[in-house]
Amino acid sequence: MAVPRNRHSNARKNIRRSHHAKQARHAAVCNNCKQAFIPHTVCTSCGFYNGKAVMTVEKK
């Protein structure tokens, strides 16, 4: 099994991990109701997906 011969500094460790942060979720705009929603999912405000009514949403 591989064992490191020399200690890695904190700076070197942090530089290596600089790309490990969570990325922000992108938002798309619904063509039916113009509300923001997560891409490739059903719009939670109107229930449309890809221009078709997939589910019914109760209006408050």
Curated annotation (Swiss-Prot):
Location of the region described as Disordered in the Swiss-Prot/TrEMBL record: 1-23
One of the GO biological process terms: translation
Transmembrane helix as UniProt keyword: no
Keywords: Ribonucleoprotein, Ribosomal protein
Organismal lineage: Bacteria, Pseudomonadati, Chlamydiota, Chlamydiia, Chlamydiales
Gene Ontology molecular functions: structural constituent of ribosome
Matching HAMAP family: Ribosomal_bL32
NCBIfam families associated with the record: rpmF_bact
The protein's name in its UniProt record: Large ribosomal subunit protein bL32
Similarity field: Belongs to the bacterial ribosomal protein bL32 family.
CC annotations in GO: large ribosomal subunit
Residue stretches in coiled coil: none
Signal sequence coordinates: none
